[in-house]
Curated annotation (Swiss-Prot):
It catalyses: Endohydrolysis of (1->4)-beta-D-glucosidic linkages in cellulose, lichenin and cereal beta-D-glucans. Its EC number is 3.2.1.4. The active site is at E95, D152. Residues 411-477 form the Dockerin domain. Disulfide bonds: none annotated. It comes from Acetivibrio thermocellus (strain ATCC 27405 / DSM 1237 / JCM 9322 / NBRC 103400 / NCIMB 10682 / NRRL B-4536 / VPI 7372) (Clostridium thermocellum). One of its GO terms (molecular function) is cellulase activity. The gene is celA. Pfam families: Dockerin_1 (PF00404), Glyco_hydro_8 (PF01270). SUPFAM superfamilies: Six-hairpin glycosidases, Type I dockerin domain. Keywords: Carbohydrate metabolism, Cellulose degradation, Glycosidase, Hydrolase, Polysaccharide degradation, Signal. Residues 1-32 form the signal peptide. CDD domains: Dockerin_I. This is Endoglucanase A.
Amino acid sequence: MKNVKKRVGVVLLILAVLGVYMLAMPANTVSAAGVPFNTKYPYGPTSIADNQSEVTAMLKAEWEDWKSKRITSNGAGGYKRVQRDASTNYDTVSEGMGYGLLLAVCFNEQALFDDLYRYVKSHFNGNGLMHWHIDANNNVTSHDGGDGAATDADEDIALALIFADKLWGSSGAINYGQEARTLINNLYNHCVEHGSYVLKPGDRWGGSSVTNPSYFAPAWYKVYAQYTGDTRWNQVADKCYQIVEEVKKYNNGTGLVPDWCTASGTPASGQSYDYKYDATRYGWRTAVDYSWFGDQRAKANCDMLTKFFARDGAKGIVDGYTIQGSKISNNHNASFIGPVAAASMTGYDLNFAKELYRETVAVKDSEYYGYYGNSLRLLTLLYITGNFPNPLSDLSGQPTPPSNPTPSLPPQVVYGDVNGDGNVNSTDLTMLKRYLLKSVTNINREAADVNRDGAINSSDMTILKRYLIKSIPHLPY
């Protein structure tokens, strides 16, 4: 009996010590458990899903499927890596490691995150940035300068490390916070053109003569500035917007950006000037800056993109355009649909946004070419369902407002919702008809102006009727 009492006493003592330890743990180690994040974006819609109650199960199923195809320990030096697909002989690019780390932290898989990050660190070059191309046997490629860095990858890796620090704390085997700060410093020193703040596409080339708008991630840079205190990153974000303003001189109002350009928005020598597989990511990276920080430049640019793609509907999106808007390809795939859905998060057209959400869920690329499009698809699904919060916010509740918040914006408009009940159906058509006959006066006037010409008349009624019988794909039209 004495031994039993002694054991009970020891157990109680251990529990008491653990209780004190738990109370002493830093708050950011227990602030959240990943998907589903119980947060709300401070600006614009938080989710464009049709049924939010189904989102978590869908995302977790997609995550398990993605891991089964993309995560491998083969050729990873004892760690784990993100492999591409059969079309590239299952190699690894640093871009994919950035995507994998963002996904792993959002789905709260710390062990996987650590394995992926250790692989990343095993492939740091002399500038403290990741080799951009490694073959399936863990060899850095030489034919394409694989030992250099790709800026978009390292900026995603840095953001993932900040997420990790805020979700899990930095007192474990990996000091995520220190790793993030070091990487962010290396990025600034080697991937930003000094004097101009132009984002270089890599640590060994580019700048004002050639840059890549799909690498522009202004929300990331604002987080870096707040996290490290290095406010030069805010100037990098501003320069990204300035370059896109230059592009607008040449894109005929489409909002489309090229794969590559100069800092003056003109074609870069020897590089694609079309909206193709690089440029497709621009809407995703830019829209996040509106959701997190309310930047009106992000909203304006993404609203233009949404308006352009709405003309053909979600099912009409293809995998290549001139920046003036002419189609140059006809494949309909995940690489292009998800990022357009992300762009719609600035709230220009919520009817079209929901159409884009459904198409993003529905369209998944075949596995032979599955790496790129399906990775972007899952990342954008996280964002457009409210599961990609600012890592510097309270990840367990409401986001912390920006330090200099912009004025609150008016509610987003659901065009066609004439009676204001949140739906667009025949009741709205009847209400609009009664309004035109002057039998009612109290309607949702902005939503009733479905052609956005500033007037409510029979043209709006015709367009709403055509939308309800599905002869036009979206509102406004």
